[in-house]
């Protein structure tokens, strides 16, 4: 993270009358938490704020209760103010139907921590060393001189605790930031449970079926191993995006595999693929080869074909 870029973003957001904040498609806690934290801070400074995400899927119920959610507007209701900020979107494509709102802005900015993000705004605050976008938003709020109260801190904590896997792969700076957010009033026990440890019973039935069909390919990744599971479209029926996405965090625990993959059938012959690695394999170029992106140890992409074909496509890339 460069303090100068955070300061530059803060200057751009000072004394502006209105701002549109865009979150990425299939929103998670980092993009929504970052968007709402920034939105609340700007609103308190007299700025007209709207926060939106491409509503191809509903907002997860765990995120709907975050402070500041009244700032959220439906994608079709977005005004599109002259100043637009994208939070946690690794590429313009991740804004999906709202990409045109971003490109039409008089002044556009991105705040993001994905290594695959090469920058697509007029001003880009991108730091792949940051554990989540929320910590970058915090740096901007500090430059703005915003008081971090319990509401803003809660939204930032949501992004931090989820993107670090409940701090399992957090950097030392993230623990210091977490302590600061807790001091500001975050109810860590409640929000950690809501965001990470809460599932409907039908999720257990889906997981049982998926894990029963998991496959290990020990020779993949030059002998480091791949474990993968397939979530058929019938199993996704009635499941939220976040519930299906959580499967990969179970699959990745297999000791015998460096890389884990979960193939989710979102439609006829269409798939989203979630990838995780433990230490040695950089997933960014693998995902990028399929038009996706993400982080070194957590990436994803979309593919088309039969289940056997999309698995074969991945194996060819490893």
Which residues fall in each region the model found?
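An acidic intrinsically disordered interaction segment
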Residues: 1-8, 100-108, 129-131, 135-137
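Hydrophobic helix-and-loop "lid/oligomerization" segment in the mid-to-C-terminal part
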Residues: 2-25, 33-61, 80-81, 157, ...
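Glycine-rich, phosphate-binding/catalytic loops in enzymes
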Residues: 38-39, 101-104, 126-127, 177-178
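Active-site cofactor/cluster-binding pocket
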Residues: 64-67, 72-122
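Short, hinge-like loop/turn segments at secondary-structure boundaries
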Residues: 67-71, 126-129, 278-279
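Conserved beta-strand scaffold positions in the cores of enzyme catalytic domains, especially
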Residues: 108-110, 124-125, 226-228, 262
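Short alpha-helices
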Residues: 111-179
